[in-house]
């Protein structure tokens, strides 16, 4: 099946799928178009290879005369040897432009995007921070000037081109200004999770060769001070909240930092800004792979600016001149989802970002939502689950009449919205009654009465939670993407969504199901200008994620239904994604527990879609030589371990069920030791259980090569796993296992 592609002059190129597709040039930028193979399913918004709607005019941002022209932003770049990917910090890549619709938007840098925003929305509120009982607001003009001042400060401190500025703290105006200022100054903006240990912070700072690290407070500062002497590239530390506990060389308050660059002329900064190209890296997002080694996802200016434009168009964000969009920033900004929504989408469309309090996820988020009343809200599944739990608890205390009314209204709401989802638009009279009596009041109580766009992503969400909110006339739309796709790849929309589907591909991008099975399921592959440049200093890992044709392999298994909606049906990778959205590779934790506790034979980490991690454990026992079945008798090594800790056990049955307190205490001690070395609280094992029988090939838990068959184990021990999560709350750090 040959693809038909038109170049900018209108010439049609008939592409032989067995041959390489020629590069085209638009605005002096080398671009590449994706190949299409007949034996693989390529699903797009239409049957044509081009994803654009020919009846729609491309949305091309107006570039003012004060902006650097697009072609000059990419001139002087060597193009003959340029590839779609790189692992080098100072390299550029081919941009994946196409010659129609959103994919043809002129590439722009972060500075060009911001300057155009200032020209359009300069006097509109950009950022709002609560100080006491008052909201302190900053306009886009002020925001832009603060970023320039910060950039000069970074230059004064010696920030080198293509070196990192690490940012370690809760969401704030200073976080945003440091991020954008680092990019203006020619460095990389690098978010670091506040839950990271000192060692994890060291890895990120060392990997990006950070010259400067910006921390929120004394708690985060201490992490950096612990590893400062192991960071040869580090030149300065800046603390943006609270007073310094002590004076140290090259340690600055935010106020001091913002005064440092006063003698840096505008021309010096402008020269650095004008040298930046859309196809060069500006941001690093650190994620974890299956080995547990964090990878620095290199995002270019174009990755970010184009994704903001394309995603915004897809979800129909309004420009501030029509009606300003308002968001609440509370999710970790080291995560691509928060960055894209809170920083870049709002910047593109002139939206206002209000910062929540640091204890947002401990309860104050509800207060902030009621105060701010956002027009768009992104919540990871755990946030929606917490809302659901809270509302159910409140409802249980209501009067009988109110409970009956709520039950009736929810039934009406779910029925009406499910019909709407399937194409029915008329709303029955009972829906309007339910809306007035229940739905509007619920939305107001949640602070979502102005919110027309409620999203969830970063982790899977349950059907129960989606239907709960749908019954209250609050459709929660799923997003799907990854750090390597600059955030969203598919999005659900009010007129195009299905329960448990993550929607359809955003404008200008493509999805391919690789090697689909008889059910249509296969690995999900991405194509578009949102696809990342590569992993910093990790060429092999880059080639694992990006194939020779440039398709991004997600590691997820999925399929499309007959209407083009994408469903995730499984995971190729073994990464666990908790309900809080944190990616956790299970093998390192499992191996660490087995190393700490020699009596452990097999360990399987549980936590996908869950609030916390738990673990299934088996003990080392003898195996029947004839059948291969595990027996009850412990191995000599296991018995020796028992003797060392004061246990007299010789059988597995002597221990399981809490019968042997010495063994249980030793295992808990080992788990605690592993938890102490974890990089965040989300990576700590909170509950565990010893199974009565070891895993085996004959039992079905292990494959022919003794590889753990996780889905099989999860199904076999579903009841035990469910028992871990029956309580609503999250257990304490040193949870005592059940007896």
Swiss-Prot record:
Quote one Gene Ontology molecular function term. Answer: arachidonate-CoA ligase activity
Q: Please state what class of enzyme this protein is.
A: ligase
State whether keyword ATP-binding applies: yes
Q: Which residues form the signal peptide?
A: none
Main location per the UniProt record = cytoplasm
Q: Which CDD domains match?
A: ACSBG_like
Q: What is its EC number?
A: 6.2.1.3, 6.2.1.15
Q: Tell me what reaction this enzyme catalyses.
A: a long-chain fatty acid + ATP + CoA = a long-chain fatty acyl-CoA + AMP + diphosphate; (5Z,8Z,11Z,14Z)-eicosatetraenoate + ATP + CoA = (5Z,8Z,11Z,14Z)-eicosatetraenoyl-CoA + AMP + diphosphate; hexadecanoate + ATP + CoA = hexadecanoyl-CoA + AMP + diphosphate; (9Z)-octadecenoate + ATP + CoA = (9Z)-octadecenoyl-CoA + AMP + diphosphate
Alphabetized PANTHER family for the sequence:
ACYL-COA SYNTHETASE BUBBLEGUM FAMILY MEMBER 2-RELATED, LONG-CHAIN-FATTY-ACID--COA LIGASE
Q: Which family does it belong to?
A: Belongs to the ATP-dependent AMP-binding enzyme family. Bubblegum subfamily.
This protein is called Long-chain-fatty-acid--CoA ligase ACSBG2
Query: From what organism does this protein derive?
Result: Xenopus laevis
Q: Name the encoding gene, please.
A: acsbg2
């Amino acid at each position: 099946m040959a693809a038909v592609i038109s170049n900018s002059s209108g010439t049609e190129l008939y592409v032989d799928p067995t041959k390489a597709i020629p590069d085209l040039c638009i605005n002096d930028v080398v671009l590449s178009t994706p190949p299409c193979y007949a034996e693989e399913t390529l699903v797009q918004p239409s049957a044509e290879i081009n994803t654009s709607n020919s009846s729609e005019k491309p949305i091309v941002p107006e570039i003012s005369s004060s902006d650097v022209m697009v072609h000059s932003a990419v001139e002087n770049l060597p193009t003959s040897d340029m590839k779609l990917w790189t692992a080098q910090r100072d390299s550029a890549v081919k941009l994946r432009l196409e010659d129609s619709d959103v994919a043809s938007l002129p590439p722009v840098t972060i500075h060009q995007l911001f300057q155009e925003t200032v020209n359009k929305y300069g006097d509109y509120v950009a950022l709002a921070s609560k100080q006491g009982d008052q909201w302190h607001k900053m306009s886009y003009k002020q925001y832009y000037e603060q970023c320039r001042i910060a950039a000069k400060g970074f230059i004064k401190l010696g920030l080198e081109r293509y070196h990192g500025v690490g940012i370690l703290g809760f969401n704030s105006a200073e976080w945003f200004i440091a991020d954008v200022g680092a990019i203006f100054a020619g460095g990389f903006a690098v978010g670091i999770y506040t839950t990271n240990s000192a060692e994890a912070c060291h890895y990120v700072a060392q990997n990006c060769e950070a010259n400067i690290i910006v921390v929120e407070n004394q708690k985060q500062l201490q992490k950096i001070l612990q590893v400062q002497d192991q960071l040869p590239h580090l030149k300065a530390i800046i603390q943006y909240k609270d007073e310094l506990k002590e004076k140290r060389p090259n340690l600055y308050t935010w106020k001091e930092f913002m005064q440092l660059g006063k003698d840096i002329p505008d021309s010096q900064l402008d020269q650095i800004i004008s040298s930046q190209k859309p196809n060069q890296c500006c941001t690093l997002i650190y994620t974890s792979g299956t080995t547990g080694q964090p990878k620095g996802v290199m995002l270019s200016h174009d990755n970010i600016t184009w994704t903001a434009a394309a995603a915004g168009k897809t979800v129909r964000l309004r420009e501030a001149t029509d009606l300003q969009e308002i968001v609440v920033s509370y999710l970790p900004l080291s995560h691509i989802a928060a960055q894209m929504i809170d920083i870049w989408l709002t910047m593109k469309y002139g939206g206002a970002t209000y910062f929540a309090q640091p204890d947002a996820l401990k309860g104050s988020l509800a207060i902030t939502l009621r105060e701010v009343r956002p027009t768009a809200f992104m919540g990871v599944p755990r946030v929606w689950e917490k809302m659901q739990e809270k509302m159910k608890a409140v409802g249980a205390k209501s009067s009988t009449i109110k409970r009956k009314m709520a039950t009736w209204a929810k039934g009406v709401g779910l029925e009406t919205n499910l019909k709407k989802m399937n194409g029915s638009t008329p709303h029955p009279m009972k829906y309007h009654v339910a809306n007035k009596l229940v739905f509007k009041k619920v939305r107001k109580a949640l602070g979502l009465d102005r919110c027309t766009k409620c999203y969830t992503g970063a982790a899977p969400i349950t059907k129960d939670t989606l239907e709960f909110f749908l019954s209250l006339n609050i459709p929660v739309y799923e997003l799907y993407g990854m750090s390597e796709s600059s955030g969203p790849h598919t999005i659900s929309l009010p007129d195009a969504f299905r329960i448990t589907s993550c929607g359809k591909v955003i404008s200008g991008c493509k999805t391919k199901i690789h090697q689909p099975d008889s059910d249509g399921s296969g690995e999900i592959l991405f194509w578009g200008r949102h696809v990342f440049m590569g992993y910093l200093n990790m060429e092999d890992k880059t080639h694992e994620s990006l194939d020779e044709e440039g398709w991004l392999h997600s590691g997820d298994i999925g399929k499309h239904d007959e209407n083009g909606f994408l469903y995730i049906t499984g995971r190729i990778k073994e990464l666990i994604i908790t309900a809080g959205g944190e990616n956790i590779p299970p093998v390192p934790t499992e191996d660490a527990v087995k190393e700490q506790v020699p009596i452990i034979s097999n360990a399987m980490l549980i936590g996908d879609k869950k609030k916390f991690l738990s673990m299934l454990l088996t003990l080392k026992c003898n195996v029947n030589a004839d059948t291969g079945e595990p027996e009850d008798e412990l191995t000599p090594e296991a018995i020796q371990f028992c003797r060392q800790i004061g246990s007299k056990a010789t059988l597995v049955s002597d221990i399981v069920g809490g019968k042997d307190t010495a063994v249980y205490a030793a295992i808990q001690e080992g788990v605690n030791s592993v938890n102490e070395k974890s990089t965040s609280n989300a990576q700590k094992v909170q509950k565990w259980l010893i199974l009565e029988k070891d895993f085996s090939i004959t039992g079905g838990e292990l494959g022919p090569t003794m590889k753990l068959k996780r889905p099989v184990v999860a199904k076999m021990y579903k009841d035990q796993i469910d028992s871990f999560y029956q309580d609503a709350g999250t257990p304490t750090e040193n949870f005592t296992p059940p007896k």
